[in-house]
């Protein structure tokens, strides 16, 4: 929440920013970073894939947890990176991009971005593992 005081004759009031707004912003920003294949662990991605197919949309907050105060936010990200990237460099770029984007959009100071790299996406693998739609059914 930010306190918007009267300055130069403007109207004062309070602005509150919901956790979901920060989580969505962080999730979308994280997916923009080169080397980040996806967010969330195997279980959350599998559950999310089923939910996304039913709802016909993707959840930008999957793999993102936030704590939002009046002026600050802390962000935790569960990340899947592409095979071959330098994880430390990707994490640094991810941390900076997410913090900068959340601050620019919300005005909140991002005090920390914690990153857990849970998996590596191998070349040729896809989000739909186990869902080989291109292969014919084995049993008819």
Each model region followed by its residue ranges:
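Short beta-strand elements
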Residues: 2, 37-41, 62, 109-116
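Short, highly charged C-terminal tails/helix-capping segments
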Residues: 112-126
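Soluble periplasmic/extracytoplasmic beta-strand elements of cell-envelope proteins
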Residues: 16, 25, 65-67, 74-78, ...
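Short, non-transmembrane amphipathic alpha-helical segments
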Residues: 87-110
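Beta-strand elements of well-folded, non-transmembrane domains
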Residues: 70, 81-83, 102
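Short edge beta-strands and adjacent turn/loop segments
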Residues: 43-46, 50-78, 120-122
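Terminal low-complexity, intrinsically disordered regions
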Residues: 1-32, 37, 41-42, 50, ...
